[in-house]
Amino acid sequence: MSRKPFLLGSLVAATAVALLAPVASARIKLATLPVRERVEIQLENENATLVEEERVVTLLKGTNFIDFSWSNTSIDKNTIIFRPLQVADKVAVINVAYPPNENALVWEVFAKEAGAVKVRISYLVGNLRRTFSYRATAEVDESKLTLRNYMRIWNFSGEDFGLSGVWAGFGEAFQGKEIGLQESKEVLIGKFLDVPVQKKFLFNWRTGQPVPEEPFQRYVTMNYVLKNSAGGAAGANALGQYALPYGKVRIFLKDGKPGMAAGEAFLGEDWGKFTGIDDEMKLYLGLARDVKVERTVKKNERQKIHGNLFNQDVIVQYKMQNFRKDGALLDIEEDMNQLRDEFCGGGKDHEASWELQNETTDKAKVERKSAQKIEIHVALPGRPKEADKKPDETLFLLHVLFKNEW
């Protein structure tokens, strides 16, 4: 008789045990595993998926052999655990045997009394994984959005799990999901309403796209920025309940044209980074060609200290114009190690030691994101209402002293 693909009792093994066993062990029989009563799939670890299943097994008084096989299924045999439930010390596993050259094992189980026993079998399985995605729909005024979080389950493990409970490692578990063989299924695991969002404009001299024929300019990028904290709807529809996993985000904007049916315009898509509680997620929308930033160096002086040791006094000027009707919040990113290398020479094997100096336009607008990264926050006014007037220029000076360089 051929072994069935997965988790079936082997009547052949039962016959072999009966023939090889001495007369005194004639009561020893092989228990056939019945169908699963409950299956739970836990997907919190991206490298290993835990499966727990419960069955009711009928045991004879004395020693029983229970066969467990997993042909063509990606189970890690070193992780398989058999646990009797709600029987205290009346049932115990006394031995585990692994038949050679087979994807199988045999539990030797001792029962003080005959009867039906609920058991839980758990194991790690491969090729059963999950990915995450999002759908962000912004309101017409772009002040709030609705964020939906989806999980897609991919089952290429070699086993049909049927109706199962599924847990992503956060949020609520889902019951009664059909997890079939060679199947993928997407489920909505979170819907967050009225999430506050800011439309920000970002300038980065080193990563920004160059502007043709403008050597001192880089294109500004547009981003939606949302914070993973409870700042919107209350209760189950609030952000900040768990860290948001990495995944693709599709971004839409509600169409608010008067006299027309409500619709949504597709703005683009971006990869949302892993976002912890109280951290920010930035979603790229595209280039902002109506916000101009020009970066120039106003001061670059070296101050000798001793030998080859020196300080470098630097002033960088940012000249900004906003051609949009509405005001804009501009973030200017600078990496202080890279800024130091720009003026002190590259190839440094140490972190920059730096201080803001007095000629900085407004030190309160310079936020330290880390030891060596800063963001300058500048609010730009909208363009004048008069068509013949140009937007005002906004200037910001960043005055930095790099200390003890060589």
Question: Positions of the model-derived regions?
Answer:
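Long, intrinsically disordered, low-complexity accessory segments associated with secretion
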Residues: 2-6, 11, 15-406
